[in-house]
Regions:
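C-terminal regulatory/oligomerization modules of transcriptional regulators
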Residues: 1-7, 26-45, 54-62, 77-118
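Conserved N-terminal beta-strand and adjoining loop/helix that marks the start
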Residues: 9-13
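Short helix-coil-helix linker/hinge
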Residues: 14-19
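Pre-recognition alpha-helix immediately N-terminal to the DNA-recognition helix
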Residues: 21-23
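Short, Lys/Arg-rich nucleic-acid/phosphate-binding segment
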Residues: 65-71
Length: 118
């Protein structure tokens, strides 16, 4: 369980950065080279590589070098695990809020106490 929590921490930490989210969004449409991923972000190649290293360490992407070109692709399994974690939390809160709504629907309203004006 602890390994799963550590993995999720790394995933959410990686996704906390807007530039990395742009890269992940782009990779959901298919593999891309490092330079392709950096173009819309207007950042240096070393900065792009640094962001990609964080994404790769989190398990969100994988990279493959063929010749001089490093190609990145998304790891759908990791995204599904993060999505499942969020979905589980959402389900828990939906159940709690439904129960609260049911309770409030059957609970009579308390009379309002009138206060004297000073």
């Amino acid at each position: 369980m602890l390994k799963q929590v550590d993995r999720l921490d790394r995933v959410f930490q990686a996704l906390a950065d807007p530039s990395r989210r742009v890269m992940v969004e782009r990779l959901t449409r298919g593999p891309a080279s490092v330079s392709e991923l950096g173009k819309p972000l207007d950042m240096s190649l070393p900065a792009v590589v640094q962001h990609l290293q964080v994404l790769e360490a989190s398990g969100l992407i994988k990279t493959e070098k063929v010749g001089r070109v490093r190609t990145c692709s998304i790891e759908p399994k990791t995204l599904r695990q993060a999505e499942q974690w969020i979905s589980d939390r959402r389900t828990t809160w939906e159940i709690r809020l439904d129960r609260l709504g049911e309770y409030l629907a059957v609970t009579p309203d308390e009379p309002k106490i009138k206060r004297r004006k000073r």
